[in-house]
């Protein structure tokens, strides 16, 4: 399930410390925010945080870097029914 290890070359100065770019490459939980969430939990303020790619649920994190779970305080991501950031605590991804 090796995904986007090459994406680690993307260095976004706005990424949150929670969002570990290096954690990409597997679908397992490598930080407090499971990569299964698409990486969106840690980078609510990240600009082009492509880490939302995680499982391909949200290929374009957009300016809000929603990731697969609505990102950090963002809302309305169809992939998770708009849980709006609850993923950061685990519930939306079932962590």
Swiss-Prot record:
Span list, region Disordered: 1-31
Highest taxon above the source species: Eukaryota
One Pfam family per UniProt: Coiled
One record GO biological process: sorocarp development
PANTHER family with a match to the protein in the record: HSSA/B-LIKE PROTEIN 1-RELATED-RELATED (PTHR31059), HSSA_B-LIKE PROTEIN 1-RELATED (PTHR31059:SF5)
Similarity remark: Belongs to the hssA/B family.
Protein's name in the database: HssA/B-like protein 45
Species this chain originates from: Dictyostelium discoideum
Gene it is expressed from: hssl45
């Amino acid at each position: 399930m090796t995904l986007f290890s090459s994406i680690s070359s993307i260095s976004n100065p706005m990424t949150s410390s929670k969002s570990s770019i290096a954690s990409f490459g597997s679908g397992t939980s490598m930080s407090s925010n499971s990569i299964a969430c698409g990486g969106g939990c840690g980078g609510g303020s990240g600009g082009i945080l492509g880490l939302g790619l995680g499982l391909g649920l949200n290929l374009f994190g957009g300016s809000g870097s929603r990731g697969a779970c609505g990102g950090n305080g963002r809302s309305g991501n169809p992939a998770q029914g708009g849980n709006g950031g609850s993923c950061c605590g685990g519930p939306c991804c079932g962590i």
